[in-house]
Amino acid sequence: MTDVAVSAEALSESLSTLRETEPLIQHLTNRVTINDVANSTLHWGALPVMADGPADGPEMAQGASAVLLNTGQVNDSLSEAIYETGVAANERGIPVVLDPVGMGSTPTRNDLVERLLADIDFAAIKGNYGEITALAGAEAEVRGVESVGEYDEIADTAQAVAESADTVVVASGETDIVATADAVYRVDSGHEMMGEVVGTGCMLGGTVASFCGGVEETLPAALHATLAFGLVGERAAEMGYNGPASYRTNFLDSVWNLTPAEAEEIDSALADRVERDT
């Protein structure tokens, strides 16, 4: 397998492609984070649409560049819309990204995610350490939608999920993991304040979907999306903040300001932020 290029130039190229193509990214997500997800998608250069009705969702998927299925809100109507939209996107060959929010916390969520995995092909799956561990069928500590506990084997776990689902897996945590069946990348970027803002995980899911909709190959899309997202978190902190609210504003501004030209100016040590397991 060819290594993915990790450099300021490669990241700039992905950002440029995303902004030039302006992919339409359909989100079926939750009401808690929907506004920040839509805005971050727009600020990356993609076009967000939040069509999530049982009829409207599958119809909108016909023209989408990528679809994000987020299980942060589970009810009968939305759950069915999530399922049918994923099926419709598959039928058109449109990349589908799964964010299994809360996987491992309730039987209802578990049943929905398992149904999605059984019937829908996913270009990428993004979840926190606990959610990815629960997807693997291992014991995970998920409290509500938050991952708690220790996950020393998360790289192996993410790779196992990638192999079983034939997809790219992004496991977000202190060190982000991007895994396929035959490669594992550890991404060292981000800031601790990202964990103090509700919705950063959902925004990462939207970011992965945006890059998958604009960048042709899924692994580079997921890897560059994860790296860019962490860099934005660091830049938001560098702007100065009084607490989570001002940091959140800085974060969205930093997404907007990470242009292809800005990415090219990132120092040459960027490659050191990503380590491939051998």
Question: Across the structure, where does each feature detected by a protein language model lie?
Answer:
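General beta-strand structural signal in soluble alpha/beta enzymes
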Residues: 27, 49-52, 97-100, 124-128, ...
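Charged C-terminal helix
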Residues: 230-278
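Conserved phosphate/ATP/ADP-binding segment of small-molecule kinases
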Residues: 110-184, 193
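Short, small-residue alpha-helix embedded
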Residues: 134, 198-228
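Glycine-rich phosphate/adenosyl-contacting loop at the front of the ribokinase-like
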Residues: 1-47
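Short, well-structured alpha-helical segments that form the helix of a local strand-helix-strand
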Residues: 157-161, 218-233, 252
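Short pre-catalytic strand/loop immediately N-terminal to key active-site residues, enriched for Gly-Thr
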Residues: 188-199
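Active-site cofactor/substrate anionic-group-binding motifs, chiefly glycine-
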Residues: 40-93, 98
